[in-house]
Amino acid sequence: TQMDNRTPEKVKFLHGLGFSQVVLARELSLAEIQAVHEACDVPLEVFVHGALCVSYSGQCYVSQHCFGRSANRGECAQFCRLKFDMVDSDGRMIEQGRHLLSLKDMNRGADLERLLDAGVTSLKIEGRLKDVAYVKNVTAWYRSRLDEIFKRRPEYRRASSGQVSLAFTPCLEKSFNRGFTRYFLDGRTPDIFSFHTPKSLGEEVGTVKDVRGKYIVVSGVKPFANGDGLCFLDEQGNLQGFRVNRVEANKIYPAEMPRVPVSYTHLTLPT
Protein backbone atom coordinates (compact mmCIF):
# COMPACT_ATOMS: atom_id res chain seq x y z
CA THR A 1 0.00 0.00 0.00
CA GLN A 2 2.73 2.48 0.95
CA MET A 3 5.19 1.65 -1.83
CA ASP A 4 3.60 4.30 -4.08
CA ASN A 5 3.60 2.11 -7.20
CA ARG A 6 2.41 4.61 -9.80
CA THR A 7 4.83 4.39 -12.73
CA PRO A 8 5.57 1.63 -15.27
CA GLU A 9 9.26 1.94 -14.41
CA LYS A 10 8.72 1.11 -10.75
CA VAL A 11 6.39 -1.78 -11.52
CA LYS A 12 8.97 -3.20 -13.96
CA PHE A 13 11.65 -2.82 -11.29
CA LEU A 14 9.57 -4.75 -8.74
CA HIS A 15 8.76 -7.43 -11.29
CA GLY A 16 12.46 -7.81 -12.00
CA LEU A 17 13.10 -8.38 -8.30
CA GLY A 18 10.68 -11.29 -8.34
CA PHE A 19 7.35 -9.76 -7.31
CA SER A 20 4.53 -11.73 -8.94
CA GLN A 21 1.79 -9.11 -8.37
CA VAL A 22 1.89 -5.36 -7.74
CA VAL A 23 -0.58 -3.18 -5.81
CA LEU A 24 -0.93 0.16 -7.58
CA ALA A 25 -1.20 3.49 -5.76
CA ARG A 26 -4.85 4.34 -5.13
CA GLU A 27 -4.35 7.86 -6.48
CA LEU A 28 -3.92 6.64 -10.07
CA SER A 29 -6.52 7.44 -12.71
CA LEU A 30 -8.01 4.81 -14.99
CA ALA A 31 -5.82 6.01 -17.86
CA GLU A 32 -2.70 5.73 -15.69
CA ILE A 33 -3.68 2.21 -14.59
CA GLN A 34 -4.10 1.16 -18.21
CA ALA A 35 -0.75 2.71 -19.15
CA VAL A 36 1.01 0.64 -16.47
CA HIS A 37 -0.75 -2.51 -17.68
CA GLU A 38 0.22 -1.94 -21.30
CA ALA A 39 3.85 -1.36 -20.37
CA CYS A 40 4.27 -4.17 -17.82
CA ASP A 41 3.67 -7.92 -17.99
CA VAL A 42 2.67 -8.38 -14.34
CA PRO A 43 -0.72 -8.87 -12.61
CA LEU A 44 -2.05 -5.61 -11.14
CA GLU A 45 -4.12 -5.10 -8.00
CA VAL A 46 -6.06 -1.90 -7.27
CA PHE A 47 -8.09 -0.48 -4.41
CA VAL A 48 -11.84 -0.50 -5.06
CA HIS A 49 -13.50 -0.02 -1.67
CA GLY A 50 -13.01 1.20 1.88
CA ALA A 51 -11.54 4.00 3.99
CA LEU A 52 -9.09 6.46 2.44
CA CYS A 53 -6.09 8.10 4.10
CA VAL A 54 -5.65 11.79 3.35
CA SER A 55 -1.88 11.23 3.05
CA TYR A 56 -0.49 10.14 -0.31
CA SER A 57 -0.46 6.33 -0.44
CA GLY A 58 -1.03 6.27 3.31
CA GLN A 59 2.40 7.65 4.17
CA CYS A 60 1.44 9.56 7.33
CA TYR A 61 3.74 10.79 10.12
CA VAL A 62 1.26 13.02 11.99
CA SER A 63 -0.13 10.19 14.12
CA GLN A 64 3.35 9.32 15.38
CA HIS A 65 4.25 12.97 15.99
CA CYS A 66 1.07 13.88 17.90
CA PHE A 67 0.14 10.66 19.65
CA GLY A 68 3.20 8.41 19.54
CA ARG A 69 1.34 5.89 17.37
CA SER A 70 2.90 5.16 14.00
CA ALA A 71 0.35 5.01 11.19
CA ASN A 72 3.08 3.56 8.98
CA ARG A 73 3.29 0.57 11.34
CA GLY A 74 -0.44 -0.04 11.55
CA GLU A 75 -1.21 2.03 14.68
CA CYS A 76 -3.00 5.00 13.09
CA ALA A 77 -4.70 7.24 15.68
CA GLN A 78 -7.08 8.69 13.05
CA PHE A 79 -5.69 12.24 13.25
CA CYS A 80 -7.35 13.12 9.93
CA ARG A 81 -10.81 12.41 11.41
CA LEU A 82 -10.51 15.22 13.99
CA LYS A 83 -12.06 18.70 13.79
CA PHE A 84 -9.94 21.63 12.59
CA ASP A 85 -10.24 25.39 12.15
CA MET A 86 -9.15 27.07 8.92
CA VAL A 87 -7.80 30.63 9.00
CA ASP A 88 -6.32 32.77 6.25
CA SER A 89 -2.94 34.51 6.32
CA ASP A 90 -4.46 37.45 8.21
CA GLY A 91 -5.92 35.24 10.93
CA ARG A 92 -9.51 35.51 9.73
CA MET A 93 -11.62 32.43 10.41
CA ILE A 94 -12.76 30.69 7.21
CA GLU A 95 -14.05 27.43 8.65
CA GLN A 96 -14.45 26.45 12.30
CA GLY A 97 -14.79 23.01 13.80
CA ARG A 98 -14.93 21.09 10.53
CA HIS A 99 -13.45 17.71 9.63
CA LEU A 100 -11.26 19.31 6.98
CA LEU A 101 -9.01 16.28 6.39
CA SER A 102 -11.62 13.52 6.54
CA LEU A 103 -12.03 11.76 3.21
CA LYS A 104 -15.10 9.85 2.14
CA ASP A 105 -14.80 6.10 1.61
CA MET A 106 -13.82 4.72 -1.77
CA ASN A 107 -16.49 2.91 -3.78
CA ARG A 108 -15.65 1.87 -7.32
CA GLY A 109 -18.37 -0.74 -7.59
CA ALA A 110 -19.82 0.96 -10.67
CA ASP A 111 -16.42 0.94 -12.38
CA LEU A 112 -15.43 -2.73 -12.09
CA GLU A 113 -15.84 -3.50 -15.78
CA ARG A 114 -13.77 -0.47 -16.76
CA LEU A 115 -11.06 -1.55 -14.34
CA LEU A 116 -10.99 -5.06 -15.80
CA ASP A 117 -10.74 -3.62 -19.31
CA ALA A 118 -7.84 -1.44 -18.13
CA GLY A 119 -5.90 -4.56 -17.11
CA VAL A 120 -6.71 -5.01 -13.43
CA THR A 121 -6.64 -8.65 -12.28
CA SER A 122 -7.14 -8.32 -8.51
CA LEU A 123 -9.30 -6.08 -6.31
CA LYS A 124 -8.26 -4.69 -2.92
CA ILE A 125 -10.86 -3.91 -0.24
CA GLU A 126 -9.69 -1.90 2.79
CA GLY A 127 -10.86 -3.57 5.99
CA ARG A 128 -8.96 -2.15 8.98
CA LEU A 129 -10.98 -2.66 12.19
CA LYS A 130 -14.07 -3.71 10.20
CA ASP A 131 -16.41 -6.31 11.71
CA VAL A 132 -17.65 -9.61 10.29
CA ALA A 133 -20.89 -8.09 8.96
CA TYR A 134 -18.93 -5.48 6.97
CA VAL A 135 -16.59 -8.06 5.45
CA LYS A 136 -19.46 -10.39 4.56
CA ASN A 137 -21.62 -7.71 2.97
CA VAL A 138 -18.92 -5.90 0.99
CA THR A 139 -17.11 -8.97 -0.34
CA ALA A 140 -20.43 -10.59 -1.27
CA TRP A 141 -21.46 -7.46 -3.19
CA TYR A 142 -18.25 -7.36 -5.22
CA ARG A 143 -18.31 -11.12 -5.78
CA SER A 144 -21.86 -10.89 -7.14
CA ARG A 145 -21.01 -7.93 -9.36
CA LEU A 146 -17.96 -9.69 -10.79
CA ASP A 147 -19.96 -12.84 -11.51
CA GLU A 148 -22.49 -10.74 -13.44
CA ILE A 149 -19.68 -9.32 -15.57
CA PHE A 150 -18.13 -12.74 -16.18
CA LYS A 151 -21.45 -14.10 -17.48
CA ARG A 152 -21.52 -11.37 -20.13
CA ARG A 153 -17.80 -11.33 -20.84
CA PRO A 154 -16.48 -14.87 -21.46
CA GLU A 155 -12.98 -13.49 -22.04
CA TYR A 156 -12.78 -12.97 -18.28
CA ARG A 157 -12.83 -15.81 -15.78
CA ARG A 158 -12.57 -16.33 -12.05
CA ALA A 159 -9.19 -17.03 -10.46
CA SER A 160 -10.74 -19.67 -8.17
CA SER A 161 -13.34 -22.40 -8.53
CA GLY A 162 -15.10 -21.97 -5.18
CA GLN A 163 -18.81 -21.19 -5.06
CA VAL A 164 -20.75 -19.29 -2.39
CA SER A 165 -24.51 -19.28 -1.87
CA LEU A 166 -25.85 -16.06 -0.33
CA ALA A 167 -28.82 -16.03 2.02
CA PHE A 168 -29.08 -12.23 1.79
CA THR A 169 -28.91 -9.45 -0.79
CA PRO A 170 -25.65 -7.49 -0.42
CA CYS A 171 -26.00 -3.69 -0.20
CA LEU A 172 -22.97 -1.43 0.17
CA GLU A 173 -25.02 1.44 1.63
CA LYS A 174 -25.94 -0.73 4.63
CA SER A 175 -22.31 -1.15 5.75
CA PHE A 176 -20.25 1.50 7.56
CA ASN A 177 -19.30 4.33 5.22
CA ARG A 178 -18.57 8.06 5.36
CA GLY A 179 -20.25 8.66 2.05
CA PHE A 180 -18.74 7.37 -1.17
CA THR A 181 -16.24 8.68 -3.70
CA ARG A 182 -14.61 7.20 -6.79
CA TYR A 183 -11.53 9.22 -5.79
CA PHE A 184 -9.25 10.11 -8.73
CA LEU A 185 -10.33 7.37 -11.14
CA ASP A 186 -11.40 9.92 -13.76
CA GLY A 187 -9.20 12.76 -12.55
CA ARG A 188 -9.38 15.12 -9.59
CA THR A 189 -12.86 15.88 -8.27
CA PRO A 190 -14.06 18.19 -5.44
CA ASP A 191 -16.41 15.69 -3.78
CA ILE A 192 -13.89 13.48 -1.97
CA PHE A 193 -14.22 14.95 1.55
CA SER A 194 -16.74 14.41 4.35
CA PHE A 195 -16.46 17.75 6.14
CA HIS A 196 -19.49 17.33 8.42
CA THR A 197 -18.66 14.08 10.20
CA PRO A 198 -16.21 11.16 10.07
CA LYS A 199 -18.98 8.84 11.23
CA SER A 200 -21.20 6.62 9.14
CA LEU A 201 -24.42 8.42 8.21
CA GLY A 202 -26.07 5.21 7.09
CA GLU A 203 -28.58 4.61 4.35
CA GLU A 204 -30.90 7.46 3.30
CA VAL A 205 -34.45 6.57 4.29
CA GLY A 206 -36.48 9.75 3.82
CA THR A 207 -36.85 13.52 3.57
CA VAL A 208 -38.39 15.92 6.10
CA LYS A 209 -41.42 17.73 4.65
CA ASP A 210 -42.77 19.48 7.74
CA VAL A 211 -42.18 19.72 11.50
CA ARG A 212 -45.17 19.98 13.85
CA GLY A 213 -45.43 20.17 17.63
CA LYS A 214 -44.81 16.52 18.47
CA TYR A 215 -44.18 14.87 15.14
CA ILE A 216 -42.28 15.13 11.87
CA VAL A 217 -43.91 14.72 8.45
CA VAL A 218 -41.65 12.75 6.13
CA SER A 219 -41.49 11.45 2.60
CA GLY A 220 -39.90 8.06 2.99
CA VAL A 221 -37.91 6.06 0.47
CA LYS A 222 -37.72 3.24 3.04
CA PRO A 223 -40.26 2.10 5.64
CA PHE A 224 -39.89 3.43 9.18
CA ALA A 225 -40.39 1.39 12.34
CA ASN A 226 -40.81 2.04 16.05
CA GLY A 227 -37.42 2.21 17.74
CA ASP A 228 -35.47 3.33 14.66
CA GLY A 229 -32.52 5.62 15.30
CA LEU A 230 -32.39 8.38 12.66
CA CYS A 231 -29.69 10.93 11.82
CA PHE A 232 -29.66 14.27 10.00
CA LEU A 233 -27.40 17.27 9.48
CA ASP A 234 -28.62 20.42 11.24
CA GLU A 235 -28.47 23.97 9.84
CA GLN A 236 -24.85 24.30 10.99
CA GLY A 237 -23.90 21.08 9.22
CA ASN A 238 -23.48 19.11 12.46
CA LEU A 239 -24.63 15.51 12.74
CA GLN A 240 -27.68 15.07 14.99
CA GLY A 241 -29.94 12.14 15.77
CA PHE A 242 -33.07 10.97 17.53
CA ARG A 243 -34.97 7.81 18.41
CA VAL A 244 -38.37 7.06 16.86
CA ASN A 245 -41.06 6.41 19.47
CA ARG A 246 -43.82 5.50 17.04
CA VAL A 247 -44.80 5.77 13.37
CA GLU A 248 -48.22 6.63 11.95
CA ALA A 249 -48.34 6.62 8.15
CA ASN A 250 -45.95 9.43 7.09
CA LYS A 251 -45.73 10.91 10.60
CA ILE A 252 -42.79 10.14 12.89
CA TYR A 253 -43.16 10.75 16.62
CA PRO A 254 -39.67 11.05 18.20
CA ALA A 255 -39.03 9.99 21.78
CA GLU A 256 -37.67 13.52 22.26
CA MET A 257 -38.46 16.18 19.67
CA PRO A 258 -35.26 17.40 17.94
CA ARG A 259 -34.66 20.72 16.17
CA VAL A 260 -34.96 19.49 12.60
CA PRO A 261 -34.65 22.00 9.73
CA VAL A 262 -37.52 21.63 7.27
CA SER A 263 -35.74 22.56 4.04
CA TYR A 264 -35.40 19.13 2.42
CA THR A 265 -33.47 17.57 5.27
CA HIS A 266 -32.46 14.00 4.49
CA LEU A 267 -32.89 11.35 7.18
CA THR A 268 -30.51 8.42 7.37
CA LEU A 269 -30.58 5.13 9.26
CA PRO A 270 -27.09 4.52 10.75
CA THR A 271 -25.47 1.14 10.16
Stretches found by the model and what they are:
Residues 265-271:
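Conserved small/polar residues in nucleotide/adenosyl-binding loops
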Residues 1-5, 9, 23-122, 129-154, ...:
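Active-site pocket-lining/capping segments in soluble small-molecule metabolic enzymes
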Residues 19:
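Residues lining hydrophobic/aromatic ligand-binding pockets adjacent to catalytic sites
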